[in-house]
């Protein structure tokens, strides 16, 4: 008999089937489903998977855009004790095969956007693969090939719907394998438990204030931990899910009005797109229906925050810092609260007004520790432990990598986030940079994120990437690549008073006025014309930026 004191992500279904029985809980295009209809769909699919032969611990890979059926598959696989491994639809077939060879799925589910993967994966390419399923088909483009695949509806047919009391678990309580983006090298499969998902979802519910009356717009892909964790929080409170296949700023703004959206999550690039499109298509019109916005994946600049408040004046805007290995958010910070007229983010601390980026306080259940560097009294590695952390990287028996042991509790492991930071006297965590991304210049350590945070405070800069390049005198030289705001121009001649001009000297002066230490100020600046190269989860590919900069410089010589 199943032990129902154990956490399971499908425990949310009982609430949906009762409290939200006749209320709409999912909207996908013209398709709307009530709580009862959604739960019946999950249970029918789960029964079909059992009849097919899916067993506890079997891995199911899903490659698809966001949809109500994606949520249905996530919960149905979990219900029968399977493990879901979402594949990024932006990957090439080669990358998808690499991921599948790692996690060894028995079943591959795709929608029409990734159906070619089902077709192109030949027998023997993925030895573990037994079944291929098309999530939903409205096209005849692949009619001949699709005859060999199962469909969601086929699996639901002629099955006895199981009871909600028939949860199953994988042997180690694993439920999802999320792939890290990996700015270099191959992505790793982060294995996440039922407990981690529920713990982190409860944190979002408590801190963001999500409730059953919320209407949530899915802006983040369900292949990423941010999208999955927030989706789980909404399932638990019984909110209504409005799903777009993928993010598009113009469509998102339209859907916000049409469906009376109250909350969504974002990253700085998404918010910038929403602001730009709102300015050009809606003349900066307000949306007073949105009440909660959770930003992740990087800090919002003061300019972006100001513009966001103008568009969403009634929204409480929060920022979160987290990582895939911690099942999403570790800390939260309120950036704007419309209920407090004089609300303003303040930055007390570290004997300097701004050192790095403040990311707020840990969630109530989160343990964070800064393991101090030998040569520092306050800065060090950021470590975490608790029920939110990953079980392991898939293929490893335990979470051997990124793990440190506390000197005070030698039998309890801490997860190394890979970030460098410090706590202030109020308990706020400040990010200084990545431990593996620091620049060693003239014997001093420089963390790119700290310099970037200063640069984007200039009104003429929309984004910045700081890298280190080989220098004959300094070892590494600090170089900043900057993207300019609209109407600003780059000129290394003396600025005309009142003009929207930027130059290396004006940016160096800006850094000095922001109290950035001299050796951290970039020695050279590169104006970046296009978008910075990003991973599929929106992280900057610093190695690629460095390659392009070196190509631009051609031959590096000492700048001093």
Curated annotation (Swiss-Prot):
GO terms for molecular function: ATP binding; o-succinylbenzoate-CoA ligase activity. One of its GO terms (cellular component) is chloroplast membrane. A motif (Microbody targeting signal) lies at residues 558-560. It holds the Pfam family AMP-binding. The chain crosses the membrane at residues 69-89, 189-209, 225-245. It catalyses: 2-succinylbenzoate + ATP + CoA = 2-succinylbenzoyl-CoA + AMP + diphosphate. It is found in: Plastid, Chloroplast membrane; Peroxisome membrane. Belongs to the ATP-dependent AMP-binding enzyme family. MenE subfamily. This is 2-succinylbenzoate--CoA ligase, chloroplastic/peroxisomal. It comes from Arabidopsis thaliana. The lineage of its organism: Eukaryota, Viridiplantae, Streptophyta, Embryophyta, Tracheophyta.
């Amino acid at each position: 008999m199943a032990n129902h004191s154990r956490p399971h992500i499908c425990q949310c279904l009982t609430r949906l089937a009762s409290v939200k029985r006749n209320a709409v809980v999912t909207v996908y295009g013209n398709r709307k489903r009530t709580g009862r209809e959604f739960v019946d769909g999950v249970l029918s699919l789960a029964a079909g998977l059992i009849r097919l032969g899916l067993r506890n611990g079997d891995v199911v890979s899903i490659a698809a855009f966001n949809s109500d059926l994606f949520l249905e598959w996530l919960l149905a696989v979990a219900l029968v004790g399977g493990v879901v491994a979402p594949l990024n639809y932006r990957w090439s077939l080669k990358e998808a095969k690499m991921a599948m060879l790692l996690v060894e799925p028995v079943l591959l589910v795709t929608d029409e956007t990734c159906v070619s993967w089902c077709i192109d994966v030949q027998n023997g390419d993925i030895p573990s693969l037994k079944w291929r399923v098309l999530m939903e088909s409205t096209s005849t483009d692949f009619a001949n090939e699709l005859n060999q695949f199962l469909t969601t509806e086929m699996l639901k047919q002629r099955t006895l719907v199981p009871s909600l009391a028939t949860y199953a678990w994988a042997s180690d309580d694993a439920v999802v394998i999320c792939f890290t983006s990996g700015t270099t090298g191959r992505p790793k499969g982060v294995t996440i438990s039922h407990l981690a998902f529920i713990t982190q979802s409860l944190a979002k519910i408590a801190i963001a204030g999500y409730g059953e009356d919320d209407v949530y717009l899915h802006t983040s892909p369900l292949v990423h931990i941010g999208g999955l964790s927030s989706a789980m929080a909404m399932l638990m409170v019984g909110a209504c899910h409005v799903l777009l296949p993928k993010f598009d700023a113009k469509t998102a703004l339209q859907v916000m009005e049409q469906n009376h959206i109250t909350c969504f999550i974002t990253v700085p690039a998404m918010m910038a797109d929403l602001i730009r499109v709102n300015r050009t298509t809606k003349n900066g019109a307000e949306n007073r229906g949105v009440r909660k916005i959770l930003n992740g994946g990087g800090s919002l600049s003061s300019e972006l925050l100001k513009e966001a408040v103008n568009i969403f004046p009634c929204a409480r805007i929060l920022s979160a810092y987290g990582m895939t290995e911690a099942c999403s958010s570790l800390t939260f910070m309120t950036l704007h609260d419309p209920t407090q007229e004089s609300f303003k983010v303040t930055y007390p601390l570290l004997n300097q007004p701004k050192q790095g980026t403040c990311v707020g306080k840990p969630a109530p259940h989160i343990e964070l520790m800064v393991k101090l560097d030998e040569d520092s009294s306050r800065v060090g590695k950021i470590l975490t432990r608790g029920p939110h952390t990953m079980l392991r990287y898939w293929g490893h028996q335990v979470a051997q990598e990124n793990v440190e042991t506390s000197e005070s509790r030698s039998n309890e492991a801490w997860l190394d986030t890979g970030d460098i930071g410090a706590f202030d006297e109020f308990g706020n965590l400040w990010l200084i940079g990545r431990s593996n991304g620091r620049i060693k210049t003239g014997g001093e350590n420089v963390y790119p994120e700290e310099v970037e945070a200063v640069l984007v405070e200039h009104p003429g800069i929309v984004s910045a990437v700081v890298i280190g390049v080989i220098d004959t005198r300094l070892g590494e030289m600090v170089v900043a690549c900057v993207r300019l705001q609209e109407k600003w121009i780059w000129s290394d001649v003396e600025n005309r008073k009142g003009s929207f001009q930027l130059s290396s000297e004006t940016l160096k002066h800006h850094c000095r006025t922001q109290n950035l230490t001299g050796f951290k100020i970039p020695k050279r600046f590169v104006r970046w014309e296009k978008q910075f190269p990003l991973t599929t989860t929106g992280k900057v590919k610093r190695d690629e930026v460095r390659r392009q900069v070196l190509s631009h410089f051609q031959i590096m010589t000492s700048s001093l």
